[in-house]
Amino acid sequence: MRSYLVNDTPQKYEVVLRQQEELFNALIKAKQIDEASEESKDEYCILCVHDPVYTIGKRTVEDNFLLNMQSLPAPIYKTNRGGEVTFHGHDQWVGYPIFDLEQHGIGLKHHIERLEEAIIFVLSHYGINSHRSDKGAGIWVGNSKICAIGVRASRYVTMHGFALNVNTDLSYYNAIV
């Protein structure tokens, strides 16, 4: 069964991260307990908006910040997702799919491609021409990134996901590369 948890009221990052981790760990545990079963395990997709926050992925280095990290206009959270630093804030929709990729017969690369395709489809619905780039995961409009993607997977179970700028205060990006 797949459930969608949607909240358009700004959420504290640490609260949603804890929720993700609980669902992620529960899905991994369910797989370990009943590996022989072909029965579908519960999957979730959290869609929300965050209070302003910077998150740093595994590839983040201090050079990714243009300002001293202590003087940033929002708090920083270290995560276990792929990618570098990104900003989450009001008027930006963030999606956290907690899926078992084995149930869908795909790997992590294909999962990321599907996320990109879904974002491109949604943007086209609003008349926005967007595309992938060889600069890395994410979606672009012209030379500007409109959607960041950073995912973690373990035992084919995913967490973290995408951040789609809708009407985001872009000044927060002035602090990061």
What are these regions (language model features)?
Residues 1-140, 145-146, 171, 175:
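N-terminal lobe of the biotin/lipoate ligase/transferase fold
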Residues 144-177:
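Catalytic cores of processing enzymes, dominated by hydrolases/peptidases
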